[in-house]
Amino acid sequence: MNSKTADAIAIAYVVLYAAVIFFFPFDYSPVAEKTVKALFNSGEVVTNTFHWAGINFSKCFTDLEGLKHFGNVVSGFPYLTGFLKVALLATFGEMLKNRRRTGSWKTSDLLPKFIVWGLYGMLFSLVFALFAKGVEAISGTALWFGPRPFVYATASFWEKVLMGFSISFWTNLIFCYPMMMSHEWFNAVIKQRRFVGGSELLASLDSKIWGSFMLKTIVIFWIPAHTITFSLPPDFRVLMSAVLSLALGFILTVKPKAN
């Protein structure tokens, strides 16, 4: 396959992924012939089910119906959707980096890297929820400044930005660098096909990348990017998280230039 064809397929892949999210035809919500109000009045238990919701193109644009469906499914199945989102896009980001560096989309050990990215996606689903709820809980107390209680629907623009920054700051300060380092360890294990000890890993790291570049990405890119993400309405966060998954795969495959 020539490079132009591969590039066209890659572009189509990104467009298709975005379209699936924006026009997501499935939902995870109460479904019955009765309305939710009727179910409530009848005393029946209202439960969420995964079901086909169809595609209403006008509502997808005016009411973001597809994004809301996708958000409901993400909320209902956080680990499964976390695995798929990050595995699909971070792996693609890694392939994109390889395309830029070598001129080819071919990436070695693609399947194990896909699985590792997926496992990180599951971890992200848990960690981001922990930090978001944790920061909201201490906001406005002696532990941390900010609005209390924080209710997104009634919060002002600057309260949302402040909360987004607070969540982003603590997430990246505590979690980001160890996560990137652990991913580098997985890469070393996959590449060498054996267990890699801590001292061996540290000795192999490029000081310019891990002592400077990665730290700068946290301050210059990740904290601002996650501030925007956590400041957005929930329906838009799924799109932003998809873009950041792509960026993550791109950034974490940076290699030192040959002398």
What does each model-found stretch correspond to?
Residues 121-142, 165-193:
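Transmembrane alpha-helix/helix-exit interface in multi-pass inner-membrane proteins
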Residues 99-128:
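Hydrophobic/aromatic-rich structural module bridging two neighboring secondary-structure elements via a short loop
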Residues 220-229:
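Hydrophobic, membrane-inserted alpha-helices
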Residues 10-37, 59:
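Alpha-helical transmembrane segments of multi-pass membrane proteins
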Residues 74-84, 159-177:
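Alpha-helical transmembrane segments
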Residues 40, 70-88, 110:
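Loop-to-helix transition at the N-terminal end of transmembrane alpha-helices
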Residues 134-162, 196-197:
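Membrane-interface interhelical connector segments
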Residues 191-216:
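Membrane-helix boundary/juxtamembrane motif in polytopic membrane proteins
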